[in-house]
Amino acid sequence: MKKFVVERNLPGAGNLTTEELQTISQTSCEAIDELNKPYHWIQSFITSDKIYCVHIAESEEVVREHARLGKMPVHTVAEVKAIIDPLTSNPLE
């Protein structure tokens, strides 16, 4: 399985209410159930006009199928090739 970052253009996303975010979350979970394939939604980050989601799936096509089933916009899907953090700056001893 691969990790993907999904960029969704959604004007006004930063102004979504708690209830609206809950509905979006429920819709995503329902779409995952409908996929009937291995799939994990890790988390999403809401900005002013976009939502960035982290998903684990077999392929980009499966990620796009999840979006189609949930009627969610998809601007880009990018496969994560590496993850770094502050600890990356220190060589292993």
Where are these regions (language model features)?
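Short S/T/G/P-rich N-terminal loop/turn motif that feeds into the first structured element of a domain
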Residues: 1-33, 40, 50, 85-93
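Short, well-ordered beta-strand segments in beta-rich or mixed alpha/beta enzyme
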Residues: 6-8, 41-66
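Alpha-helix C-cap/termination motif
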Residues: 34-35, 69
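A short linear hydrophobic-aromatic micro-motif
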Residues: 37-43, 76
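An amphipathic, aromatic/His-enriched active-site/gating alpha helix that lines ligand/cofactor pockets
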Residues: 56-83
